[in-house]
């Protein structure tokens, strides 16, 4: 996906990028590749691949959810900033918090935010399991997002405690989402979530399947969740 295709395919979906926003994506790409030589941020470094599999793929969430309001967003395990930083570039009014367990990635994100001149962004070095217990952030976000980090039953325990009642958990998944939903239904129920919508589409050019799940937070999450670091992964909430 070259820059012209990136721009026109977003335009088709009603997302028009200014020259400044296009410049921010260029700076993002250059900074990502430069830092990737020092630390492992991504296996994808070829420019057209980064634009398709990182930038465009992150923004697809906005094809199925309206980001036009100044929502507070928490991105869990964003690594090099996906999906929330590409969304923040497209929708500068969003208030973004990224939680990541690796300090080196947080250092990269702080540097990136300065280079991109982003405001209303915060980067927290923490495990999602401990972050989700903290006063002031628990059940405080309009939207919590995660992109293909873990299976749905595990991801729900890391993300739903952070979503305010009435808010939305957006899980961005690859193929095999149906199986994950089946195995994750019980966790959603326990944690106060309700699957409202699942959208399946092909990522352009490479035709790989993507699924975006919109999960509404209906009820407060019981206090015991999330459990201790590592437990959600070892003992997922599944029947």
Curated annotation (Swiss-Prot):
Signal peptide region: none
Residues involved in S-adenosyl-L-methionine binding: 77, 82, 128-129, 147
Record's subcellular location: Cytoplasm
Protein function: Specifically methylates the N7 position of guanine in position 535 of 16S rRNA.
Disulfide pattern: none
Species annotation: Bacillus anthracis
Record keywords, A-Z: Cytoplasm, Methyltransferase, rRNA processing, S-adenosyl-L-methionine, Transferase
Main location: cytoplasm
Protein name stated in the entry: Ribosomal RNA small subunit methyltransferase G
Family classification: Belongs to the methyltransferase superfamily. RNA methyltransferase RsmG family.
GO terms under cellular component: cytosol
Origin organism lineage: Bacteria, Bacillati, Bacillota, Bacilli, Bacillales
Superkingdom of origin: Bacteria
HAMAP family: 16SrRNA_methyltr_G
Entry's Gene Ontology molecular function annotations: rRNA (guanine-N7-)-methyltransferase activity
UniProt-listed Enzyme Commission number(s): 2.1.1.-
């Amino acid at each position: 996906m070259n820059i012209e295709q990136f721009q026109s395919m977003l335009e088709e979906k009603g997302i028009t990028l200014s020259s400044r926003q296009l410049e921010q994506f260029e700076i993002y790409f250059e900074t990502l590749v430069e830092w990737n030589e020092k630390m492992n941020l991504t296996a994808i470094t070829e420019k057209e691949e980064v634009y398709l599999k990182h930038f465009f793929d992150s923004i697809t969430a906005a094809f199925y959810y309206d980001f036009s309001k100044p929502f507070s967003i928490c991105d869990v395990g964003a690594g090099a900033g996906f999906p929330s930083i590409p969304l923040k570039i497209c929708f500068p009014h969003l208030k973004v918090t990224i939680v990541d367990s690796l300090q080196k990635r947080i250092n990269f994100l702080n540097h990136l935010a300065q280079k991109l001149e982003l405001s209303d962004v915060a980067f927290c070095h923490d495990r999602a399991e401990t972050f989700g217990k903290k006063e002031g952030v628990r059940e405080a976000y309009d939207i919590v997002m995660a992109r293909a980090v873990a299976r749905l039953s595990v991801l729900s325990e890391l993300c739903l405690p952070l979503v305010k009642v009435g808010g939305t958990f957006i899980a961005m998944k690859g193929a095999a989402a149906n199986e994950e939903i089946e195995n994750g239904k019980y966790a959603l129920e326990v944690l106060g979530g309700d699957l409202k919508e699942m959208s399946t589409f092909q990522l352009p050019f490479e035709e790989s399947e993507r699924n975006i799940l919109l999960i509404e937070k209906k009820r407060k999450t019981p206090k015991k969740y999330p459990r201790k670091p590592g437990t959600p992964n070892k003992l997922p909430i599944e029947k």
